[in-house]
């Protein structure tokens, strides 16, 4: 995978303002996860594309790219958790949007500052409704409920 650094676009370090909506950031990250799953070599063109398509600044898109890379680094671990929670379905049979919504949500749960589980589930459902099909919402909610209530999995059980 090609690497993209902020220096490629500007000489200043990246900082994100508190005013940037977290919902919008999740949408951009989800789009990046999807795009990089479809074409891993497309990273260099992803930043300008998302800047034009989402009307978001370069700084925020680069922050999203950094978060996306962090999720991809943990994807094997996250995929294992998702796969273990599936009862009558294989991980490979999941739609790509569903996989990436689950990865994003679980990454936020296990590797980010604490966020209420109900908020994470609501955000996952919102993303599925926006980027996939609403019929998948109960399935996503059930998977996340199973994972969040599994006592063997908690924020401290994964390697950070």
From Swiss-Prot:
<dbReference type="InterPro" id="IPR006027">
    <property type="entry name" value="NusB_RsmB_TIM44"/>
</dbReference>
<dbReference type="InterPro" id="IPR011605">
    <property type="entry name" value="NusB_fam"/>
</dbReference>
<keyword id="KW-0804">Transcription</keyword>
<dbReference type="GO" id="GO:0006353">
    <property type="term" value="P:DNA-templated transcription termination"/>
</dbReference>
<dbReference type="InterPro" id="IPR035926">
    <property type="entry name" value="NusB-like_sf"/>
</dbReference>
<protein>
    <recommendedName>
        <fullName>Transcription antitermination protein NusB</fullName>
    </recommendedName>
</protein>
<dbReference type="GO" id="GO:0031564">
    <property type="term" value="P:transcription antitermination"/>
</dbReference>
<keyword id="KW-0805">Transcription regulation</keyword>
<dbReference type="GO" id="GO:0003723">
    <property type="term" value="F:RNA binding"/>
</dbReference>
<comment type="function">
    <text>Involved in transcription antitermination. Required for transcription of ribosomal RNA (rRNA) genes. Binds specifically to the boxA antiterminator sequence of the ribosomal RNA (rrn) operons.</text>
</comment>
<comment type="similarity">
    <text>Belongs to the NusB family.</text>
</comment>
<keyword id="KW-0694">RNA-binding</keyword>
<keyword id="KW-0889">Transcription antitermination</keyword>
<dbReference type="Pfam" id="PF01029">
    <property type="entry name" value="NusB"/>
</dbReference>
């Amino acid at each position: 995978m090609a690497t993209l650094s902020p220096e490629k676009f500007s000489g200043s370090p990246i900082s994100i303002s508190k005013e940037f909506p977290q919902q919008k950031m999740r949408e951009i990250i989800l789009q990046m996860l999807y795009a990089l799953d479809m074409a891993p070599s497309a990273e260099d063109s992803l930043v300008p594309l998302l800047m034009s398509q989402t009307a978001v600044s370069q700084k925020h898109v680069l922050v999203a790219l950094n978060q996306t890379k962090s999720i991809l680094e943990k994807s094997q671990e996250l995929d294992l958790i998702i796969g273990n929670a599936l009862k009558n379905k294989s991980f490979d049979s999941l739609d790509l949007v569903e996989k990436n919504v689950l990865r994003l949500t679980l990454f936020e749960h296990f590797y980010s500052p604490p966020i209420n589980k109900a908020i994470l589930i609501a955000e996952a459902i919102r993303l599925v409704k926006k980027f996939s099909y609403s019929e998948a919402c109960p399935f996503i909610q059930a998977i996340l409920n199973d994972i969040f209530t599994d006592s063997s999995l908690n924020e401290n059980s994964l390697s950070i």
